[in-house]
Amino acid sequence: MKKFVQDLTVTSVEMLSPKHVLLKLMADKPLPEITPGQFVEVQVDHSPSTYLRRPISINFVDDQKNELWLLIAMVGNGTRQLGKLKPGSQLNCLYPLGNGFTLPADSNEKMLLVGGGVGIAPLLHLGYVVKKRGGTPTFLLGARTREDLLELDQFNQLGRVFITTEDASLGEKGFVTNHSVLQKEKFSRIATCGPKPMMMSVARYAKANDITCEVSLENKMACGLGACLCCVEKTNEGNRCVCTDGPVLNINQLLWQI
């Protein structure tokens, strides 16, 4: 898939929580085809501490507005700078990078989208595309507390939403794999993104129940093009660069001890 380096215009900066910001970026021409699960690498600036581009999952794509959304956790100097951008600013982006989630071949296929923390980001776009193709996605979203649950209104517009929080402030108490919906219903496909322990738990559930499952890995990366090899993941097919062979991989490819 062809990649582009473009200056995109910031049209909106919305603080979703003290730690999370939603940037909406507009291109001056039609966006390329973007598969749910792909990501961008953004250039913060050219100072030594933030010289390397930051990989950010694509949260949503609005083709009518030539706009893409980036949901960002402000955890370091680079991402905190992104949170300080103003509408009208320019952000240099390399995109679309990596692969994406496999879409259901049948609109009747029962698909579960499991996200934890800011790992929910690519699932909004995925759920939108699944619904657009005639499907009805089910979301299972987890967080430590209700304040960490993001974009719930948007998810509720796309399908059913089930929630867990560790402190029981919203939804069922506990982790996503403890939610009662997993005991009550059967799913044929799972897509998940979030903290690695959560994804491993989801993968364990999927394997035990013979469910096709893909995970979106969040390995640290730099170039986004498979050249620097800092994002390598060991698989049963050899070493794979998460930035080019991923970030989405089938759990049967992984060497996780689950």
Predicted regions and their residues:
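FNR/FR-type flavoprotein reductase catalytic core
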Residues: 77-218
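Structural signal for conserved beta-strand scaffold positions within catalytic alpha/beta enzyme cores
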Residues: 12, 60, 163-165, 215, ...
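Short, basic/aromatic-enriched C-terminal tail that caps enzymatic domains
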Residues: 1-4, 239-258
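Short, Lys/Arg- and Gly-enriched loop/turn segments at beta-strand edges
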Residues: 48-56, 98-105, 243
